[in-house]
């Protein structure tokens, strides 16, 4: 078995101050799988933020692990209380990132990793320092194949997501890093190298 390597972390060095990473991608591009792999290899260095959402969980999803699944009423109450650093309405459902959750991850000495949509990532970037990463499928045909294989959307929903992916793809040039996920392991190694490089980036 290959030994797990921990990313060096020294809170006393300015380059190692906890950071916020955002990972965005069209549905089906593989961002969730890649982030899960990262969390498994580096549990002491990185922690995924949990977005709040009003959408229904998929069969394999668990509240408190994948998202915080809440009612629209609760989401709007939190929105009125200014609990969100960013929020969006996407495909008729609300998604939001809590500033408190990011702060708690930072206090634990870990980097925060937010897996959020393109609009949310760019919104965060405009408010606080953020390392932005975009994951792309190699083609629209491959993206459609993955969505069909996932089987969590009706045909009309899948087509809506595919159309939206064109908008997301067009915004990829606003991200610092772009990974084309045509091979999962290769893409993971690229993602890991980005995190390690950012861990050692000097603050000038």
From Swiss-Prot:
Annotated binding of ATP, by residue: 25-32
Superkingdom classification of source: Bacteria
UniProt entry keywords in alphabetical sequence: ATP-binding, Cytoplasm, Kinase, Nucleotide-binding, Transferase
GO terms for MF: ATP binding; guanylate kinase activity
InterPro entries, per the entry: GK/Ca_channel_bsu, Guanylate_kin-like_dom, Guanylate_kinase, Guanylate_kinase_CS, P-loop_NTPase
Reactions accelerated catalytically: GMP + ATP = GDP + ADP
EC code(s) of this entry: 2.7.4.8
Keyword ATP-binding: yes
SUPFAM superfamilies given in the database record: P-loop containing nucleoside triphosphate hydrolases
PROSITE patterns per UniProt: GUANYLATE_KINASE_1 (PS00856), GUANYLATE_KINASE_2 (PS50052)
Compartments it resides in: Cytoplasm
Start and end residues of each Guanylate kinase-like domain: 18-196
The UniProt record lists the keyword ATP-binding: yes
GO CC, one annotated term: cytosol
CDD domains reported for this sequence: GMPK (cd00071)
EC main group: transferase
Protein family per UniProt: Belongs to the guanylate kinase family.
Purpose: Essential for recycling GMP and indirectly, cGMP.
PANTHER family the UniProt entry points to: GUANYLATE KINASE, GUANYLATE KINASE-RELATED
HAMAP family per record: Guanylate_kinase
The protein's name: Guanylate kinase
Biological source species: Chlamydia caviae (strain ATCC VR-813 / DSM 19441 / 03DC25 / GPIC)
């Amino acid at each position: 078995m290959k030994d797990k390597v921990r990313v060096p972390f020294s809170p006393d060095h300015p380059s190692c101050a906890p950071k916020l990473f955002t990972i965005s991608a069209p549905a089906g591009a593989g961002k969730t799988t890649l982030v899960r792999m990262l969390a498994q290899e580096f549990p002491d260095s990185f922690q995924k933020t949990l977005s709040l959402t009003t959408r229904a969980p998929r069969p394999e999803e668990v509240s408190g692990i994948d998202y915080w699944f809440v009612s629209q009423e609760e989401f709007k109450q939190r929105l009125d209380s200014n609990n969100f650093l960013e929020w969006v309405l996407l495909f008729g459902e609300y998604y939001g990132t809590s500033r408190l959750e990011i702060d708690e991850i930072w206090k634990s000495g870990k980097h925060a990793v937010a897996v959020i949509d393109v609009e949310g990532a760019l919104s965060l970037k405009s408010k606080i320092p953020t390392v932005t990463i975009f994951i792309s499928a190699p083609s629209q045909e491959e993206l459609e194949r993955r969505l069909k294989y996932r089987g969590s959307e009706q045909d009309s929903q899948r087509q809506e997501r595919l159309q939206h992916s064109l908008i997301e793809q067009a915004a990829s040039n606003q991200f610092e890093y772009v990974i084309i996920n045509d091979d999962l392991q290769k893409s993971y190694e690229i993602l890991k190298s980005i995190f390690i490089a950012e861990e050692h980036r000097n603050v000038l």
